[in-house]
Amino acid sequence: MRLSQYFLPLLKENPKEAEIISHRLMLRAGMIRQQTSGIYSWLPLGKKVLDKVCKIIREEQERAGAVEILMPTVQSADLWRESGRYDDYGLEMLRIKDRQKRDLLYGPTNEEMVTDIFRSYVHSYKDLPLNLYHIQWKFRDEIRPRFGVMRSREFLMKDAYSFDLDYEGSKTSYNRMFVAYLRTFSCLGLKAIPMRADTGPIGGELSHEFIILAETGESAIFCDKKFFELTVPHSSIDFSDKAVLANIVKQWTSFYAATEEMHNEEEWAKVSDNDRLSARGIEVGHIFHFGTKYSAPMGAKVMGQDGKEHLVSMGSYGIGPSRLVAAVIEASHDENGIIWPKSIAPFDFGIINMKPNDEKCTRACETLYSGLMQAGFDPLLDDRNERPGSKFATMDLIGLPTQIIVGPKSIAQNEVEIKDRKTGVKKSLTVENVLNQFFRI
């Protein structure tokens, strides 16, 4: 993409309404625009990052055996009355009526609808286990939406729902998603720590939050530093091996880790002083095992091998892709802007033409641009007639992992400068060596 043809509405000043780093940088980098309180449009740069986050989530869900569906944003109130949650959910739920005066709602979550889908089609234990997931926009009418897309009223969610014959099978499905989440966050460049959590309005008996460390995190967290020595499972892991899954979950839950709400001073005192870490954290995922909480009132049953009907045991597993984008920025930025992990950067390279009216500079930039695209990369070429300082500031702000700087002095020596956005380290290479290096990747 050529920046002269791209829609990138940058802001020079920090917006007054932005209280945290991610909100400030997402507005300044032209990623989002607020339409009304807690509701945002995603502009081209932000949409590219959001799509890459969703791609990684999909890959890891499907690696773990989940099957994608798509459920509507608008749901019938009757399903929620059937589960008993319609009156319990409170003012966060946006309730609406159609022209026939039927009660509808804009879904804040999908346990009822997916249970209805399941009970309509699945009737035998032979069709279990089953895990269905979707990625869809949701709405919760937050009392005080703030922090940009970190706590917005409309947000994108990946929800997965598992169905099993009994508790043992359901626990394995829970472990499977637990491990899939560890891998997902690792692929996004994040070190997420699983912590026991309150089940909240979703309900159930077992729950873990996945927390990343960030100075501007919304909650205090307490954890053992040994978590940072653990290795995330490789992509070759066998998700059908119950023992392997259980062992990984045991390993990742054997050290103390708790949010402020679940913190236990007696247990914390057992952790050695050298291993204690008190910090701030951001929730990036939440998983629940809730057994028959929804299958019982909604009659989701299957015929077992014993010839009897069994209520299915369920779990739900949520990741917010839109929130994750902000969380990554909170965890990875500096005073100049965003520092994207390579896996979700909106573009792979930023090519800076310091002097567009210089024939040699322009020719070198075009060679690099076409060569990188041929190699399967997605470069952004800054071909605007702007001051070099402005171009450097733009590239630092939007956080592309690698900058390729083409100026008249260096190109006279047939060289360009490569800058690593994260480390700031620069090196000079010939145009040919740049292309040869990245063709080998």
UniProtKB/Swiss-Prot annotation:
Record's GO cellular component terms: cytosol
Checking Pfam families in the record gives:
HGTP_anticodon, tRNA-synt_2b
Q: How does it assemble?
A: Homodimer.
**What's the main place this protein lives?**
cytoplasm
State which Enzyme Commission number(s) the record gives. 6.1.1.15
Its family remark reads: Belongs to the class-II aminoacyl-tRNA synthetase family. ProS type 2 subfamily.
Which protein are we looking at? Proline--tRNA ligase
The GO biological-process annotations, alphabetized, read as: prolyl-tRNA aminoacylation
**Is the keyword Ligase assigned to this protein?**
yes
Q: Which domain of life is it from?
A: Bacteria
Query: What's its job?
Result: Catalyzes the attachment of proline to tRNA(Pro) in a two-step reaction: proline is first activated by ATP to form Pro-AMP and then transferred to the acceptor end of tRNA(Pro).
Does Protein biosynthesis show up as a keyword for this record? yes
Q: Which species? A: Bartonella quintana (strain Toulouse)
